[in-house]
Amino acid sequence: MADIIKLHDLRPAAGSNKPKTRVGRGEASKGKTAGRGTKGTGARKQVPAAFEGGQMPIHMRLPKLKGFKNPNHVEYQVVNVADLAEAFANGGDVTVADIVAAGLVRKNQPVKVLGNGEINVKLNVTADKFSKSAVEKIEAAGGTATATK
């Protein structure tokens, strides 16, 4: 029976770990210019990582950003009342899960119902948020609009 391989017995393949070349340590191996060539900026000193050869750098070409990013901003997925009327033509109760199942929005994200279009079906809609016009149109059609947030 073969011996079990143990972690402390593992060794890298021969030649896979080459020693680092120390440059500039005598004429025998990469001495004198140390792989930098003879003259020029690269031979004399390092240039900054963002240096673009005299061209106007990207951080100066782009405009400064104004304002700030609100950490409490919530991005809602929107669905219009016309889409709800088309997807749920039989009426009844409609939840966010039903809207996701109908393919109108993606799952695991808050949903806002907007009032674009017409609705003539009685729907009891439960969603995260509603616009005023959406609530008016849903209630005018005989349904209810319940916001969960």
UniProtKB/Swiss-Prot annotation:
Gene3D superfamilies: 3.100.10.10. The keyword Lipoprotein does not apply. The keyword Disulfide bond does not apply. Keywords: Ribonucleoprotein, Ribosomal protein, RNA-binding, rRNA-binding. SUPFAM superfamilies: Ribosomal proteins L15p and L18e. Residues 31-45 have a biased composition (Low complexity). Pfam families: Ribosomal_L27A. InterPro entries: Ribosomal_uL15 (IPR030878), Ribosomal_uL15/eL18 (IPR021131), Ribosomal_uL15/eL18_sf (IPR036227), Ribosomal_uL15_bac-type (IPR005749), Ribosomal_uL15_CS (IPR001196). One of its GO terms (cellular component) is cytosolic large ribosomal subunit. Part of the 50S ribosomal subunit. Belongs to the universal ribosomal protein uL15 family. NCBIfam families: rplO_bact. PANTHER family: 50S RIBOSOMAL PROTEIN L15, LARGE RIBOSOMAL SUBUNIT PROTEIN UL15M. Binds to the 23S rRNA. This is Large ribosomal subunit protein uL15. It comes from Corynebacterium aurimucosum (strain ATCC 700975 / DSM 44827 / CIP 107346 / CN-1) (Corynebacterium nigricans). The lineage of its organism: Bacteria, Bacillati, Actinomycetota, Actinomycetes, Mycobacteriales. The gene is rplO.
